[in-house]
Amino acid sequence: MKKVILVRYGEILLKGLNRPIFEDKLMSNIKRAIHKLGKVRITKSQARIYIEPLEENYDFDEALKLLSKVFGIVSVSPVWKIDSDFECIKENSVKMVKDLINREGYKTFKVETKRGNKRFPMDSPEISRQLGGYILRNVPELSVDVKNPDFILYVEVREFTYIYSEIIQAVCGMPLGSNGKAVLLLSGGIDSPVAGWMIAKRGVEIEAVHFYSYPYTSERAKEKVIELTKILATYCQKINLHIVPFTEIQLEINEKCPHEELTIIMRRAMMRIAEIIANKTGALALVTGESVGQVASQTIQSLVVTNAVVSLPVFRPLIGMDKNEVVDIAKKIGTFETSILPYEDCCTVFVAKHPTTKPKLERIQLSESRLNMEELINKAVENTEVLTITRD
């Protein structure tokens, strides 16, 4: 009998002939996620991944916590690996059940069996019936409740047999790095961290770009964005955060452009800078936290004018979500409490009181022609600070 970790994945199973590529990527990401906990053997078999510690006193709790944040994993379980012999299964199941009773005080149970090894002489229902009866005879304080048991004893009969009682849900999605790279425009608000998490869930690596308007925004605002990046890195393992000095550009726009156009012209400048960084880092798309109609710069007309300034595709994972839905995800992934800290970002300074909601591209381009934008953008890119944020 040996304690190991069972990893389940879902969407990867639909990938046909390319499935091994995604499985190998997931196994690589798993190895990176838990490498500091000690040496392990990672294997795959029959749509499962098994992690077998090679050292004593392995920290299973920490490993399970880390694995639950690895994109591509549906769920994980600490399991006992035993021989696929029914006598062995019965004896070890009783040991596990008695241990659970001592720790948790359970009174009722049921057995669920999956038989992947078709050479095993009993089918799944028969295994469950006979094993359940054996447990009842040897653990008289337990009773069966098939509808609402205190715990379920899971049995998977494969080349080896795996018994367990705990299933820990993970984040699902696709393995990080299996779908290229994108640049996330990361503010200090609620929306953009959620957008970054959602695009990363689809297997996309992130380069984050934050626009910093010192002294109009404080050092604490910068620290807040770094903290948000750290939270995202617990899922993404590593994120490069590009902190772009944006004050001169905002001052230029504020001085020379119609007040109602400030926001849309500022957004277009951000997109241009983000695209330059994307081209430098090999990213293939831009990602924002915009949602249709949420604010003036996020009407369909405004989004069309914003998109027109770049050639890369712009992904908006939150496009059809309302604020409550976004907040729910922010709370789930751990960014919400940091996002609501009351520190200004560049989007909250030089704000138009009555921003245009139906901008015309030709008029915006005419206003931009009054600006020394090329020089200011190049200067901002040259003076960008890059921080590498890791999950460790």
UniProtKB/Swiss-Prot annotation:
Among the GO biological process terms of this entry, one is: thiamine biosynthetic process
Does this UniProt record's set of keywords contain Manganese?
no
Q: Recorded GO terms, molecular function?
A: ATP binding; CCA tRNA nucleotidyltransferase activity; tRNA binding; tRNA-uracil-4 sulfurtransferase activity
Task: Report the locations given in the UniProt record.
Answer: Cytoplasm
Query: Which reaction(s) does its UniProt entry say it catalyses?
Result: [ThiI sulfur-carrier protein]-S-sulfanyl-L-cysteine + a uridine in tRNA + 2 reduced [2Fe-2S]-[ferredoxin] + ATP + H(+) = [ThiI sulfur-carrier protein]-L-cysteine + a 4-thiouridine in tRNA + 2 oxidized [2Fe-2S]-[ferredoxin] + AMP + diphosphate; [ThiS sulfur-carrier protein]-C-terminal Gly-Gly-AMP + S-sulfanyl-L-cysteinyl-[cysteine desulfurase] + AH2 = [ThiS sulfur-carrier protein]-C-terminal-Gly-aminoethanethioate + L-cysteinyl-[cysteine desulfurase] + A + AMP + 2 H(+)
Q: Which InterPro entries match?
A: Rossmann-like_a/b/a_fold, ThiI_AANH, ThiI_fer, ThiI_N, THUMP_dom, THUMP_ThiI, tRNA_STrfase, tRNA_sulfurtransferase_ThiI
Which NCBIfam families did the record assign?
tRNA uracil 4-sulfurtransferase ThiI (TIGR00342)
Recorded protein name is Probable tRNA sulfurtransferase
Q: Which gene encodes it?
A: thiI
